[in-house]
Amino acid sequence: MQIYNSLSRRKELFTPAVPGKVNMYVCGITAYDLCHIGHARSAVVFDVLVRYLRHTGLDVTFARNFTDVDDKIIKRANEEGLTSQQVAEKYIDTFYEDMDRLNVLRADIEPKATGHILEMIALCEKLIAKGKAYATPSGDVYFRVRSFPEYGKLSGRDIDDMRSGARVAPGEEKEDPLDFALWKSAKPGEPSWTSPWGEGRPGWHIECSAMSEKHMPLPLDIHGGGQDLIFPHHENEIAQTEAALDKPFVRYWMHNGFVQVDAEKMSKSLGNFKTIRDILEGYLPEVLRFFLLTKHYRSPIDFTFDSMDEAEKSLKRIYEALSLARTERGRSKWSATPLPADVTAEFDTLDRAFDEALEDDLNTAAALGHVFGTIRLVNRLLEDKNLRKSAETLALLERLDGLVAKWMKVLGVFGREPEAFLSDLKECRIRRKGIDTTKVDALLEERKSVRAAKDFARADAIRDELAALGIEVRDTPSGAVWDVL
């Protein structure tokens, strides 16, 4: 598999340090608020990576942490009249609920920062002993950025350029404006722990270094997160870990792209902040997951309701095809009509292309393209009145079951019973569009009556009236059925 390594800024052949085993760490949430669509993207991207690596036979140990002590958590605790621990527990619970709805697998290891205070203190002590960090009279501990010559190697930033715009804030006791906090002295009303430098709490960056070192052998095979974490968080992780341990921290760095909303940066100040729960009020969770896979993970993705509608339509087409394929397989008689020679070859090619897309830096967008190619091929066979009855078509439909199982295993979508998904989708669209089903049923009943009376003009007028409400009517041998456009 080729992976784009943010450190080398190029694709590299992925080879685990220990053949057959992968140690992977992804930065998790700071537990102070509901998860937004940016969190969803990172979670889904690395969930698919774990799924695919396991699909290829690798033994993956996946860790994703929780930051449960932080300035933002303390602020939220004061706002809500809770302790910091209560706030963190509350939002860790909502994180799990959201991830379960998005079919994101649980990590194998889910460390919390507050459970690793001793490891963080020990790491600080190592850095101080090596002259890479220093304690201040007030009990803060800072990392000496200039003591690490490779600082900036991940983000590509020049240390002198960073120095030109840096300032020491009033009250800080930094030797250099570039230095960052490893340990913060206690402030009134904040959670704190006993340390050699007095009561205090860890800085954000030291948390991931301590947790990853405790639970996994270093260097990590893969460390992931959003592009917003490259600097300063991941840059600082590298500096403090490699300075303390004198060995590489991570072999492959992976970062997913930003999520925009209507082509603008998502922010509360712009009023375009979208939590996962906001979105799932109007869409099925599988639609959101599918949408997040329609772009390459390193590319930015623009969330709009139009793009969600398109993702919903695409997913619906796939499930409709799977439903039709299942119905056709119930046929009792099959013919000996041969399929065109290229059909089976095309089916095989599309299957291989799906895997090849994911081998190429986890290109889910291209992989979904091959899923659609497979669905179009199946539809083409089922729309042909002769080929749909062929025993060779039955063989391909049986193979389709295996492909769908693989798509579900790797991408985490297409795993529901088609009829159940389509029924839930219809109900979801009815709620989202505020459709009055009583009115729809009454119009359909009237249409049935006027058709029986051969008043086709009125029947057509009712169809148009329903279409204006966003309702599509199809006449079948067993009667009219309707769906939401």
From Swiss-Prot:
Pfam families: CysS_C, DALR_2, tRNA-synt_1e. A motif ('KMSKS' region) lies at residues 265-269. SUPFAM superfamilies: Anticodon-binding domain of a subclass of class I aminoacyl-tRNA synthetases, Nucleotidylyl transferase. Its cofactor is Zn(2+). Its EC number is 6.1.1.16. GO terms for biological process: cysteinyl-tRNA aminoacylation. InterPro entries: Cys-tRNA-ligase (IPR015803), Cys-tRNA-synt_Ia_DALR (IPR015273), Cys-tRNA/MSH_ligase (IPR024909), CysS_C (IPR056411), Rossmann-like_a/b/a_fold (IPR014729), tRNA-synt_1_cat_dom (IPR032678), tRNAsynth_Ia_anticodon-bd (IPR009080). Its main location: cytoplasm. Binds 1 zinc ion per subunit. One of its GO terms (molecular function) is cysteine-tRNA ligase activity. It comes from the Bacteria. ATP binds at K268. A motif ('HIGH' region) lies at residues 29-39. Belongs to the class-I aminoacyl-tRNA synthetase family. PANTHER family: CYSTEINE--TRNA LIGASE, CYTOPLASMIC, CYSTEINYL-TRNA SYNTHETASE. This is Cysteine--tRNA ligase. The lineage of its organism: Bacteria, Pseudomonadati, Thermodesulfobacteriota, Desulfovibrionia, Desulfovibrionales. The gene is cysS.
